[in-house]
Each structure stands twice: as structure tokens, then as C-alpha cells.
Amino acid sequence: MQFVSWATLLTLLVRDLAEMGSPDAAAAVRKDRLHPRQVKLLETLSEYEIVSPIRVNALGEPFPTNVHFKRTRRSINSATDPWPAFASSSSSSTSSQAHYRLSAFGQQFLFNLTANAGFIAPLFTVTLLGTPGVNQTKFYSEEEAELKHCFYKGYVNTNSEHTAVISLCSGMLGTFRSHDGDYFIEPLQSMDEQEDEEEQNKPHIIYRRSAPQREPSTGRHACDTSEHKNRHSKDKKKTRARKWGERINLAGDVAALNSGLATEAFSAYGNKTDNTREKRTHRRTKRFLSYPRFVEVLVVADNRMVSYHGENLQHYILTLMSIVASIYKDPSIGNLINIVIVNLIVIHNEQDGPSISFNAQTTLKNFCQWQHSKNSPGGIHHDTAVLLTRQDICRAHDKCDTLGLAELGTICDPYRSCSISEDSGLSTAFTIAHELGHVFNMPHDDNNKCKEEGVKSPQHVMAPTLNFYTNPWMWSKCSRKYITEFLDTGYGECLLNEPESRPYPLPVQLPGILYNVNKQCELIFGPGSQVCPYMMQCRRLWCNNVNGVHKGCRTQHTPWADGTECEPGKHCKYGFCVPKEMDVPVTDGSWGSWSPFGTCSRTCGGGIKTAIRECNRPEPKNGGKYCVGRRMKFKSCNTEPCLKQKRDFRDEQCAHFDGKHFNINGLLPNVRWVPKYSGILMKDRCKLFCRVAGNTAYYQLRDRVIDGTPCGQDTNDICVQGLCRQAGCDHVLNSKARRDKCGVCGGDNSSCKTVAGTFNTVHYGYNTVVRIPAGATNIDVRQHSFSGETDDDNYLALSSSKGEFLLNGNFVVTMAKREIRIGNAVVEYSGSETAVERINSTDRIEQELLLQVLSVGKLYNPDVRYSFNIPIEDKPQQFYWNSHGPWQACSKPCQGERKRKLVCTRESDQLTVSDQRCDRLPQPGHITEPCGTDCDLRWHVASRSECSAQCGLGYRTLDIYCAKYSRLDGKTEKVDDGFCSSHPKPSNREKCSGECNTGGWRYSAWTECSKSCDGGTQRRRAICVNTRNDVLDDSKCTHQEKVTIQRCSEFPCPQWKSGDWSECLVTCGKGHKHRQVWCQFGEDRLNDRMCDPETKPTSMQTCQQPECASWQAGPWGQCSVTCGQGYQLRAVKCIIGTYMSVVDDNDCNAATRPTDTQDCELPSCHPPPAAPETRRSTYSAPRTQWRFGSWTPCSATCGKGTRMRYVSCRDENGSVADESACATLPRPVAKEECSVTPCGQWKALDWSSCSVTCGQGRATRQVMCVNYSDHVIDRSECDQDYIPETDQDCSMSPCPQRTPDSGLAQHPFQNEDYRPRSASPSRTHVLGGNQWRTGPWGACSSTCAGGSQRRVVVCQDENGYTANDCVERIKPDEQRACESGPCPQWAYGNWGECTKLCGGGIRTRLVVCQRSNGERFPDLSCEILDKPPDREQCNTHACPHDAAWSTGPWSSCSVSCGRGHKQRNVYCMAKDGSHLESDYCKHLAKPHGHRKCRGGRCPKWKAGAWSQCSVSCGRGVQQRHVGCQIGTHKIARETECNPYTRPESERDCQGPRCPLYTWRAEEWQECTKTCGEGSRYRKVVCVDDNKNEVHGARCDVSKRPVDRESCSLQPCEYVWITGEWSECSVTCGKGYKQRLVSCSEIYTGKENYEYSYQTTINCPGTQPPSVHPCYLRDCPVSATWRVGNWGSCSVSCGVGVMQRSVQCLTNEDQPSHLCHTDLKPEERKTCRNVYNCELPQNCKEVKRLKGASEDGEYFLMIRGKLLKIFCAGMHSDHPKEYVTLVHGDSENFSEVYGHRLHNPTECPYNGSRRDDCQCRKDYTAAGFSSFQKIRIDLTSMQIITTDLQFARTSEGHPVPFATAGDCYSAAKCPQGRFSINLYGTGLSLTESARWISQGNYAVSDIKKSPDGTRVVGKCGGYCGKCTPSSGTGLEVRVL
């Protein structure tokens, strides 16, 4: 406590004053002990006093010393105590009022104060981020202070005109008014800022307020106005106009275009940000109404603000926000806007807040992202966030004149509703208000948008600069217009939710009272700054620096704060010095009268007139509320249709801009604008989008179209004030008139008739179908393809009556969908690329149309079906009342009557028309009949309340309603009470009697359930007992419900279920049909043994189809010729039945039809004699022709194959005729060769060189498989059986042999200068120094038989040089004969078999070169020319022409992964298609029947990294994920991998030694009682080795010392206390009276004893009786036992009990005790669940209880219901549970869509997905995963969406369950999809399941079925996605 230090300071001050001897001596106070801020204050004061306020009560009496106002702390008390600041030791209640007294300046001041929190929200919260720094130690030194209760407002000395505004936290801080002027008071602060808020008599400074003297100004500096529109600017070192700005919205209007902003605003429309509005509890309601708006604001102050303002920060910020709130209360804004601060976040450490730098744009972006993270649904919600910083923010590196920054129109966007403001003193409030204006979509007052509103000079809140002419308290007309339109258009829905009601009123105090004019200068220009004297007061605040008043007065053009004193008795208000108003009344606004309706917006076609009213009778003043209610109303005008030749109204508005190019690149000066309809978002339909004629580029030329403009081409709705409003075809606002099928607005379909027909005649070219007359409506034409394919060579066409084609003319067909405008009508065409080609239009056609069909190609018959409505001719029509209309509803639910409705009918076609047609005709009587005859209506008593008196007479209420009693089943159904109005309703109140007993029912165990399933009952007995378990009469327990019977086993029994019968397996004759039969329990299939086999339905039964038809062939007819070659015919008929009835040939199998023609040959003919002329026969044969079908697919996928088609002879009627009738015509080919793509061919490159240079070696070559373009392909694409050889033998010349002596090669020397270096020649002949020298013998010239050898012989001298004079006769031989053995000869074997039986085959034999001993030699060793042939032709005779090999299609690969093979059938076939033996085709090369193939990649186990050890010390486990995977990304089921090679997923690990934890017990506390047995406690904690306290779970629980023990002191004394007897419990018969009997402890010092419930054994003696019998008179009433229904079983499994109520009641349903107890029915019985308690509840229990180790489906008991769950990983210790999805992966999938629009600002095709979109498919995060099973956590009942073990990713990356997204468009056009279908699983999603959108422009559209089993969603953005909320997860429940 700091009282001593304050007392010392006060003593020193008093001593200093005494030494000075006068009041003026106060200036000589020891100021070195005061805070510097107060030192400066005292220096400016002419007089002041030091006082100590005293808190008093309302009578002026001092409070006790322990009562003092203090600043409250956030604690649990604040939740229950509305004013915790007042502490009292007594039991007096706290109050919101406070009274203080002080003496100063010779006067007594008595303060009467009332709490006043102003603008602070009831749940206002202050959040501190980080630890205060060294220089911030005084900022919330202990815990955050609650300032809401600090603010008080009241009056002085009982005079309400003498206002006081005081903050009572840490002393009295504020101002008050007296008869002699205004006073200020504040507590003294010491040098170190210490003060004691608990101290009562704290010294305060009190001083008068006087106007400062000022000197004239020397002049003003010029203001610099920047054109930059993006930021606010501020002063630097010289006077400068301050700039405010905004971030420009990308879609401007025409005014912005004309000002040159088109480049930025129209670079590409659609880049406009499409804000995602936060969905709040309020839905969009009616527009153009003024609603109260509540702007919940988060204010964030950075660490620089903390450093600058210190402990005063919160006060300062609340003062700023009070000014902002008052600005938004000004009536000039035209709306009721309430600014409410809900949260203040103070950032001590820079790292804990958003990144703040000098760059304003970056800071805003960082702050917006940061604040969104603080706006969680479960936390403190805010609508917008404001950042206050002392950081000098800049719009560029060298342009730091920015004061604030915000984006336009983002108030309800949770990601972008934020702004930043640089703190510059109290004028910061105007910056905050300005930036919030941008958030409300207000432009600057000098913006081109505002010129239309007549704002010529920016002088209001949204002025771009704050200068001398600015009025920052009021709003311009432009600002009012834009915020009103913004809110009326529905962009402020999040502001409709009102914060919780405030506990007290919130008036606003003026900031100038809290901050004097010098303090305002310091806040702007720093410490030491003071107001410049002699300047104009209030209008602008001029401040000087510390160097003197004449050296640098400067201003930021901000006015003095409201409430700043300017002259005696006056203060500043809105920049003017005005008299102080003592008690300004608050005036709420009220609506004025409606203005007359204005001019019509259109001259025809439905315009709008508008009337408005202003909030001006009166206007809101002095903080009053703005009007609430409708401000505009509309009515239709000029609704008559426009002339047909008049241009479209939207077209006229676009044409207004013809010739205006707005400086957009690429637009010509004569540009022409036309309306843009398609591709515009629904919410933008009332903006004027125009397209450049002849181009696709479009732009927004106006913010809104003219009122009355249709919203689109396909609707009657019209635009009003930029919103699409409902209108009818009569062009009247809010009309529901629609055109009937005849095109008549509001018609009854009676003015037209329907014309319908078909057309199927074919002729080449254009064929006329029908003429559609002018005036036709509802045209629908469809052309069905004959084969269901899109390509059938028939196309619809339209032409005008003049023959001009409108669609598909001149043999040019439109394949894509298109629209055709014919006058004012729009005709839609589906395009020719559809199986059903369609032309349709609902509009009235004003000209005649000719419908045609274009037939080309193969001239298939068209199938055209058309219908349209045409006006009825003007002849009179007859109408009559038809009494046989539909039955109307029954007049009553029971015993009522219903009648047929009379309908007006047209006689000509019996069409029902409007009743107006029959108005003047007499109506016949109604046809009636009784209805609801199977039930009755009566009043039903549903229930009775308990008796109002527990003892004696009372009453109870009855729940009575009108009920429908069914006579059939006796059920009761509640209906409206009005149906029972014919019967008097019984009273809902009846008398009753309380039994005055304290008894209760004691039950026996429930009996076993009477049925094991399908609902049985259980019973139990009930006995009435008292608290001592004494048995009482049952009448003593009638106040409690007796439950002795209950229902049990209410789940259904397993039942046989059967599917639909299949079709009969035969089409004729007798066959069978099948159906599935299974055992089902709920939604689950069980094993058949679970159902009764005796009742199993049959699964197969016989079926009888019509008798089968067969072919019957007649005898052959005569040969067609009398000689030579001819043919014979016979009749072939299709017959059926015993009587052999002839039926159509289509009823017989065409494949088995016998031939009806054959060749015949008679003797050859002799040449006929020449005849002069032959006469032509006049017989005309029937006209026949060959018809053929389409070719089948080629039998081979590559290379040569075959294809076939159906060929049939048809007569002129198209019926099948005998082929003989077409014999004279060439028969079309029915089978031919085909080739889809060439197969791969083997390509062999050149042989390599031989591997040796002599002798035998090997040569190799490369063999590749290439396609038709010679590109290398996989070898499996080529025939493996015909692969060329890749290596072969090769022979080189024989290798030389080495001699044993020299090792030199035996060949003659070729070089005459050769000189041996070593050995001497073998033979030497010497002559005169010259000698012959010989070389070695060469090889034998022949390898066999006789040959010769040669050697070199040379003449050399003694030196070895060549000489010429050697003796010739002794010259050695140069050649000699040699013998190498016998030569090899050609040997050959026998010829092999011929490769073909005919047509020229090949046969081969073995031919080798060898010696007689069998030694083989290369072929070159024998004479090649003599080599016998090793192959020759054979069987060269011609083969039959009608046999060939035929191949079937290749089978699928034999393996699903890895290498395998596939095969096909190869068979020999005759020309007529019949099969032959293979020998007939042996002469042909047989195609291969086998080939290699390769499946996908085989799944393999993939093990992840080991996790960290499960413990930080000791022995633990490590785990890793082991999954079955295909490739690197695709996840497979674990069953697809080999379970025996699965890597381990868990292993042991060893951590460091664990620390030792022990229990530590502290000292015992005092005993809880002063007498008798009590208890005492002590604290027992767990500590570590260092004696530090840790969590108790770390110590051994078994060794924990006791923390409680009994303590026994002196015995207590007790006494019996009895009460008065009650009245008798009954009015007749035997009853009893009661009284209270209590054992009470004797307390010392108390005169009276209290009733208590001490145990009775403590009291001495016998307990006095508490019940006494009584008898008043006999009861004449008889009674019977009545039983209720059995309750539910007490256990979910095993044996339990169930109960029912048994009551003794009189005939009047009154409780009685006259029933015979021996006849009482049982009230309690045992029950047994059909399933025993050993049913497993998870897969781990399945493994433990059943010993199962196989993965599969098992029944688990989940939340009381048996469900089928798939258990996976049963071989491991931790199996997992999965839910098998009954509807499979077709309805359970997740997708991240991969396409991205080239122009992401569009949403083409109205959001539909099209593969032909203008897209690129490059989104890297795309993927598609489908799910067969999903994992479930049975503990939390949550779906684990990221488990993909049973998911199949067919495209891209895996996508978690229930997740979707895309990167498709930024225009709310989601394409990513997910689907959940839990039907049949027994589970459904809970209501808490939520999805959140993430990413940029993220949007989601999620639809849930009512039962939660089905969810479908579309999500996306640019780029965005939706995932289940992490807060709620994907929780499921058991159905």
C-alpha cells in the first residue's frame, strides 16, 4: 500500500505552501517529486489547491474507512456483481450511484454521481498480447482493469445545471461546473507514476478553467492538395493539407471512365472483387427500409501506442471511439448507425500482433489477415476491425503523407472488413470515421461519382483532405446516397444483430472535457506542444513547438475537441464557440410526409414512379435516434406494351454511349455498344453491362439500369433502384401475372389449341415437315436419332415464309447449342451433336415458319415429333359447367362430406378453362359423397398434472385436445380444436386431494421380456414404503407415478427380404426367373441362419414365355434353266405352334435360317439358232434391293482384321425377301478386311562386325519394335513369335599358327628390306661372302587334300644387305607340296514336310559341310557353288478359294498388374462364314493366338518414417504408417498387398531415465467443527527431484499420503424440536396427521433452536412421534386397480428390470385406498435383452472375444444398436474400424476440379460444368477420390476424413473425404464437388456438422438431407475449397 508515500508527499506540499506564505507560492512546490506531465500542468495554472475527496452517503455522512471506490479486476465476481467496485463489509446492497464531498476555494462541493458507460458494449473485452516492456511497467501492472464502471455523470450541490463528468478509477478524474465557472480535478502522481487506487484520502489537484490568451497569427501556409486517391495524408515538418483516401473499387461507373480511370477500372471486367458476405442470423428482408444497424468494432492498438500513451491508452481510445460514435449518429448520414466497441486488443510485443511497417498497403493486408484469425465463431465477434498505430505509414517510399487506408464496401466481409489509422491526437477520430466510411462503400466527396449529387467542394467527413473548409462532423449528400444504397442492396445484413441489452444508459461525454487544449496539442505534435495564442478559437487547432509561440505555429486542420472551453460560459461544438447548454434534450427523429410520386421512368413497357420521405419531423438532434421504417415506395406506370419496332430498353441505354470509347485501348471512335446478357451474375443483372458490337469484350457502363428495365431476356421481373424485383407479364410491380400456354398474359389457356404430329419420310435434301403459322406459341420440335447415336444424317432446319433459312440452311449444320431471335421471340436450338435434336420456344412467333428436316448420307428415316399452340379461329366457342371436376377436401376430418369441384370446360376439346368463361351460365348441383366415415371426433384428455396440494384438497389441470379416433385400429390423432366445436369442451381443471404422505415406491426386478424382438413387455412389483422402509398402504404413494410395466426388445426381428424378380431367362418357351433373398436386420444384411429358414421365400420360379418359333424349309423347285448352269429356289418360312402358323421372319433366329437358293447344273446347251429378233418379256419381277447395316468394329485393334455387317434382300415394302429375288443384283460384301492402325513391326539394323578377326566368331545387330511412322514403341506391341535373330555365327580367315622354334608367323616376307633381329636363317648357302637366306614356310595353300607351301629366299652379303651374285644352282626351294588331310564334302538329309498343303509351300532339309568322320566345317570350307539346295517349293497346286484364317478379339490381360499374356481364338473359316477344320487353312500363315501384355503397376508396401518415441523417458513405443501403395502416389487397399511381407508398424524405443517423483504433505489445517466429529485437511502435492510441484499423475497413487482425517473435539449437545400437527390427511376414512420432528444442535449464544436434519441418534431419549392416526367419517366410494404401460428395461444387455404403475382409482379417477391388496397386479418384473452383454463394441474386442484375425465385416454394439462395421488390420494390435458405404464410390467421392477459366471473373453456362469451356487444365492440386469405406472413431463418433485406405484416387492427388474445391473462377462459380451417402449404414451426420470455406474468393453450396444421411456440396474459388469444420468435425449418430 502506497498510503505512506502519499502522506509524505502531501506533507511536503503543505509544508512548501506554508513556507511560501500565499496561494501564489504554489508555484514553488517541490515539483521534483511529481510526474513531469503534472509539472507542466502546474506551470500553466494561475491558481490551484490540493484537496482530499471524501466518499459519503446520500445524506452527506462519511462512509466507513473500509469502503472505497476502486478499479475492478476481471474475476469471477464480475459475472454476478453488476457494480463490484463498491466494497462493503456489511450486507448493504451495492448501487450504481456514488456521493463524494470536498472543500476547495472556500466552498463545499457535494457530488451526486450516476454510472455512465456511453458507447461501450456490455461484453466489452480488453485483450493483452505479449508481456509489457521495460518502459511499460505501469500499463495494467497487476491485471487488466475494467473501465466500464469508471465513467460517472451527475451534478454538484443538488443543482442539476451544474454538471459533473468524473472517472472514479484511481481517484477522481474529470470536470464539473459550478456557479462561478468550470473546475478540473485529478489525482496527484508521483515521479515514478505510482498511485494507490485503494487509498481513500489520496491528494488531488483542483483548479479552475480559464480561457488562454492568444496572440494574432502571423499568417497561414498554403495547402498542398494531392490527386492521389488511395490514401490519407498527414503533416510532416511543414503545414500541409491532410489527405484521406480509399482503395478504388475495380468496377467504376461512366463518370469514372470519363475521368480517365478506365484503364484501371476496365482493364478486364470481372476482375472486380466479388465479396463473400458473411452469413449471419438475419436473412435478407425488405429493401428501402431504415433499420437500426449495430457496427461491432474491434480496436487494436500496437506497441507504439502503448509506449506513447502508457496507462492512459484505454481511456484515450475510448475517447476517440466516443467521437466516432457521435459522428455516425449525425442525422446527415440518413441511417441509424450505432458504433459499438466490443473488444480492445493491446499489443505489448510486436511479434504477437500483425506485421506493421511503413508500407500502408502491406500493413493493411497483414492486419486484415490477422484480425480474421481473431474473429472465430466461438470467440468475440466483430463486424469490422480498426488498427491504431504510431508507425509512420507511407503510400510510397518517399511519400509518407498517409494517415489511413481501407477498402471500399467490405463491412460484412470477414476477410476484408478492416482499416488502419495513424494516431495523430484527437483528430484520429475523424480519420477512423473516414476510413469506416470507405468500409461502408462511401467514395471521397470529390469523386466523380459525387458530382451528380451536386457536391462541388469537399467539406464533410469523406473529404479527401482535412483543411480549413472541412466539416468533419457531417456527411455529404453523396455519402448519404452511397451508404443508403449499400445497405438497401443487402450488403449490411451482418449489422442487423443487436448486441445484448445494456444494463444502463450510455450517454456520451465530450472529449474536450477530458483533454484540455494543450493536451490536444501534445497528442498531435508531441510533449511540450501548446496552443498558439491569438489564433481563431475552435475552428482550427494551431500549436507551437517548444522554441516559442512565434517560431512555428502549425496545424493539421483539425478543430478543437468538442467540449473544449473557448470563452467563459462557452465551449467548442462542431468548430464553433457556442454557449454551453445546461441540459440539451435528446430529440429522436420522426418521418415526414411522403412526397408526391415522381415522373415515370419509362414511356411504355412498364416504368416506375418513386415517392420518398425524409426523417425531418423532427430531425434527430443531440444524439437522438434516426427514423426506422420504409423511406421509399414505388408504383408501376406506363405499363402498356411498347411498339414492336421500338428498340429493346436496355439496348437503348447501351446505345446512349455509342461513339464513346472511354480511352480503352483497341476501341474505335465510332464504337457501337449492345447489351450483354449472358455470363452476368444474378446479383449484377441490374447493372448496365454493354458489349462492343462485333466483339466479346464487355464493360460496366452504369452502376444500375433505369428503373423498369427487365432483369433479363427470360424473365418478367424488372429492376428498381438497382435490385431485381418481382413483376408480371403485365409489367406491373409485384404482379404475379404470367403468360398462359397461348402466350396471353394472364390468360386461361382457352384462346389456343395444340397442334401435334410426326414426320418420318426420307428423301435426299430438305423435306418439309410442317408450316408453323404466325402467332404460334410453345413450339417444341424433336428429332430422335434412329440408333440413339448423334450421327444419323438427319438435321432439323427452319426457314421463313420467304424461303430464307434461319437455321441449318444451305447444307451447313450448326453442331453447338445456339439461340435464334425471330422478332421479339427467342428460339432455342440444341445443336446437332445430340441424340435428340430439339427446337423449342415459349414465345409468340410473329411470322410464319417452315419446319424442315435435312436428310443426307445413308438416308435413314427421320423421326420428327412436333407440337405447338395456335390461336383459335374467331368463331364462337361453347363452354359449360362440368360437375365432374376433381374431388375437393373433406369438410371435416371425420363424418364429413366432400364434393366435386365445378370446372368450366370448352366443348370442342373438353379443355378446362377459366371460370370467367362460364360466369353467366347456371351452375349445376354438386356431386357429393360422405367421407371420413371410419373415425369420430371427440375431446381427449391427454394427461393430468400433479395435484396442486400435496396434502388435502387442491386442483390439477388437464391437457385436453380435439382428437380423431380411428374405428379401424383404435389410434388417436390430434387435430385442430375447431373440429370439435360442436361438442362442449370439458373443463381443463378438476379437483384433487393430496395424500400428505412421504412414501415412495420400492420396485422388484423386471421380469424377462415377453418377446426377444419386435417389442415385448416386462413387469415388476411395486411396494409403497416410507423413508424407514416400512410398508405403507399404496394410497400413500399415489403422488408418485408407479411404473410396473415397460416395453422391451423394441428393435425389429431379422426378416427375410427379397428383391425384384429377374426377367425370364428365355424369350420363348419354358424357363426360370430368379430373385435375391436375404436376411436383413434394420439396414444391415445378416447371415441367413439369423432368420427362420421355414419362412424363407423362394428365390426361383418357373416362367412360361410364348412358344418358340422355328424355320421350316420347303422342297427345292425346278432348276431355273433347262441346260447349263442355273439355280433352284425353295420356300423358307418362320412358323410357330402346333398349327404351324406363319409369323414374321424377325421372330426366328436369323443366324440359323436355312438357305433358300442353290446352284444346279443340267447338260450343256447347244448354241441356239440365230433369230432375227427376240421379244422382251412383259413380265415385271417385283422390285427388290439389297439392304445392309453398319460395319461392326474391326476385329483387330491394330494391323489387319475383319469387320462384318448384316446384308439382307428386301422388297419394295422393306420386308425381308428371299435372296433369290436379289440374285440379279450384285450382293454387297458382308465381310471385309480392315485395319485400325498398323501394328508394330520388327526393324533389324545392320549386323555388327564379326567379334573376331580370324576364325569363328559372332555378329550381332539391334532389333527394335517400331510403328507405322518408324517411331520406337514398346516391344509388347510387336509379335514376339516373329522377332528376328539378334546374333549369328560369322567366319573369318583361318588364324595363323606359330612355329615352335621362332614363334614367327609362317608366311613369306613381303618386304625386301626385312632384316631379322635375332635368330639366324634356317638354311644358309655362302658364296664369296654372299649367301642365300630363307624365311619360314608359309601356310598350306589348301586346308584339305593336296596343296603347296611357299617361303622367301633372298641373296644377302655378309652384312645382311641384298646382293645379286649368289650361286643360282644352290638356291633353296621356294615352294613345296603339302597335305592337310581329306577335304570336307556337302552332306544333306531328307526333305521335311511341306509348309502348305496347297498354293505353293516350302520344304527344307539339312545341308552341312563335313568330313567323312563327321567333323563339321563352315560352309566356306566346301565348294559353295556345289552346295545342294536346302529348301524348295512344294504343293504348288492351287488351293481352294473359300478358306481363310479368322481371328477373334484379344482377351484381357491375364494379370491385373505386372507382366502377363493375352490370347485370341484363331480358326479356319469358309467364305460363307462357316467354320472349317484347321487343315483347310494350313497353306496360309496362321495368325498368332498369344501375345505378351502388361498390367498396371503392382501394389507394394510403403512404410513411412518412424514417429517419435511415445514417452520422453523410460521404455516406450515408436510407430509408423505402413500402407499398400501403387507407384508413388496411388493408395491401394491393404488386402491387395502380400500380408506376409508387411513391414512392422510398431517397435520398442528407450528414452532417458525418468525423473523420480514423490509425494509431499504439508501441515494439517484446523478442524472443520468445534464439537463432535469433524475433519481436517492438508495439501498433498507431487514434486520432482528439484522439489518443484508437478501434476499428480506423475506420482504413484498407491503411495499418496492421506489429505483428510477425522478430528474429535468435545461432544455436542442436541435437543428434540417438534412442530404443530397438520390437518387430517383425508376427509373420510382412516387418515393421519403429521408434524415436523427434528434433532437440533444447541448453539451457545442463541435463544431459539432451528429445525435441522441431524441424525436422530444424537438426541437424548425417544423421538417424539411425527405421524398420528385420525378418522373423520366413512367413505362410500368404491375403487379398482389400474395399471400403466411397462417402462423400458433398466439395462441395455443382459438381465434387468422394468416397471409399470399400478394405482387404486375410483370411478372418477380419484386415488383411493379401498382396493384389495391381494388383487393388486404386479408392478415390477425382470427383462432380458435379446443380445448378451458379450457383444463387442470395437474391433479390438472382436479380436479378443472371438479370436478373429481376418479383416472383414463384424457386428458391433454401438450406442445401443447393432451395426455392421468393417474391421481392418486385424492381424495387428490396433485394428481400425471402417464403415462400408452401401452406395459405394459412385455417391461417396471428393473432388478438387482441375480446370481453370482463362477469364476467372466469369461464371459461364450459368455455373454448369462444361468440358468445352474456355479453360486450361493446370491446377496442380486437382484430384478425384472415391470411397468404398470410411474410417470412424467410435469413441468420438467422428469420421476421420483423411484416412484414404479404402479410397480410390482415379485422377490427380488424393482428396480427403467430404472435401471439395477448385481454382475455376472468382465469381461464385464453384465446380469442385463432394458427395456423402450414408444411407443403409445405420449412421447419419449430426446437426453440428459444418463446413468452412478456405482460400481466395471461396464459396460453397452444401445441401443436407433432413435425416442427415445424404450431403452433396459444390465448393471452389480462385483458388478455394471447403472442408469439415475443425471445431465440429464430421460427427455421426446412430439412427
Swiss-Prot record:
Residues 229-242 have a biased composition (Basic residues). Glycans are attached at residues 112, 135, 271, 749, 840, 1213, 1267, 1788, 1806. Residues 217-228 have a biased composition (Basic and acidic residues). The spacer domain and the TSP type-1 domains are important for a tight interaction with the extracellular matrix. The record marks 287-288 as: Cleavage. GO terms for biological process: aorta morphogenesis; camera-type eye morphogenesis; cornea development in camera-type eye; endothelial cell-matrix adhesion; extracellular matrix organization; heart valve morphogenesis; lens development in camera-type eye; melanocyte differentiation. Residues 588-643, 878-936, 939-997, 998-1049, 1052-1109, 1110-1166, 1182-1240, 1241-1296, 1328-1379, 1382-1440, 1441-1494, 1497-1555, 1556-1611, 1612-1676, 1677-1734 form the TSP type-1 domain. Disulfide bonds join 368-418, 394-400, 412-494, 450-478, 521-543, 532-553, 538-572, 566-577, 600-637, 604-642, 615-627, 890-931, 894-935, 904-918, 1250-1290, 1254-1295, 1265-1278, 1624-1670, 1628-1675, 1639-1659. The gene is ADAMTS9. Residues 753-877 are annotated as: Spacer. Coiled coil: none annotated. Residues 1-18 form the signal peptide. Residues 509-587 form the Disintegrin domain. Residues 192-242, 1289-1330 are annotated as: Disordered. GO terms for molecular function: metalloendopeptidase activity; metallopeptidase activity; zinc ion binding. Residues 1735-1935 form the GON domain. The lineage of its organism: Eukaryota, Metazoa, Chordata, Craniata, Vertebrata. This is A disintegrin and metalloproteinase with thrombospondin motifs 9. SUPFAM superfamilies: Metalloproteases ('zincins'), catalytic domain, TSP-1 type 1 repeat. Zn(2+) binds at residues 223, 434, 438, 444. SMART domains: TSP1.
